[in-house]
Amino acid sequence: MTMPYYASPEQLMRDKSEYARKGISRGRSVAVVTYADGVLFIAENPSSTLHKVGELYDRIGFAAVGRYSEFESLRVAGVRLADVRGYSYNRRDVTGRVIANAYAQTLGEVFTQQMKPFEVELCVAEVGETPETDQLYRLTFDGSVVDEPDFVVMGGQAEAVSANLREHFLPGMGLAEALRVGVQALSAVSPATSAGNGGPALLTAEQLEVAVLDRRRPKRAFRRIAGAALRPLLDRQEEDGVVAGEEPHTAAHAPSVPQPGAPAGLGDPGAPDTGGTAGSGGEAPTT
C-alpha cells in the first residue's frame, strides 16, 4: 500500500514563504520617505500606466511591489473599505491603521489557508497634521504589519536601498532633498544605471514614479509629480554633482507646490472630486 504524501505544517509554511519571497525579489524597489511637508513615494517604474503608487483616501497613500494582479485587487479593496467606512461613519474614522489591519487580516488568511500565498509587499502611509503624526505601515506576504519610522523600502534590493537611506536620511528634509536621497538610493542598486549596466548615474524621470502626500493640501493630500514638474527636480541633482555614493549635503527646504506642466492632482481646484479612485493604481508585472 502506497503511503500518502505528508508534509509538516512547518515545512508548508517555509515553502510558502520561500515562494513568496522569490516572487517579490523580482520586483523593482520602492522607497517611501517622510519629509518636512509629508510623505514622498519614489518607485523605479518605467510604465506610465501601471502604477506602483496610488491614493486610498483623503490623507492615505498606497505603495506595493510584487505581482500586479494581486496587489491591484488589494488596492481596490482598500479604496472601497475607506469609502464605505467614511460614508457610514465619519471621514476622520478612516485611518491608515484601519486599512493596514484589514490588509494584514486578508494577507494572513490567504497565507495560512490557501495553497498559493500573495506575492506582494505593501506600504500604507498616512500623513498627519505634523511630521510626528505621520504613519508608515509595512505589510508582508504573511500578514505581518510593522509601524516603521522615517522610511520604508520594498522590493528585491530592499536591504541595500535601506542601508543607503539609513546613511543619508535626515529628519525634516525638504522635498528636493528627500527626492535626491531616495533616487540616489534606488539608483545605486538599479541595473538600469551605471552601477549595474553602464547607464546614467541616476534614474531618469521616465524610469521613476513619484508622488507625495502633502499635509498642507486641503482635503485630499495625494499628488503625483511627473513630467515637467519632476524633471527640474532631477536636473537640479545632476547640476549639484550628485552621484551614487557621494556624501549628501543639506538642501534648503523646497515647498511641495505643483509646478507648471504637472498633471492635475487630486484636491486641485481644477481637478474634480472623483470619489477616491482617481490617481490610484498598481505596479507593472514583476520583472
Curated annotation (Swiss-Prot):
Pathway: Protein degradation; proteasomal Pup-dependent pathway. InterPro entries: Ntn_hydrolases_N (IPR029055), Proteasome_alpha-type (IPR023332), Proteasome_asu_bac (IPR022296), Proteasome_sua/b (IPR001353). It is found in: Cytoplasm. Its main location: cytoplasm. Keywords: Cytoplasm, Proteasome. Pfam families: Proteasome. GO terms for molecular function: threonine-type endopeptidase activity. Belongs to the peptidase T1A family. This is Proteasome subunit alpha. The gene is prcA.
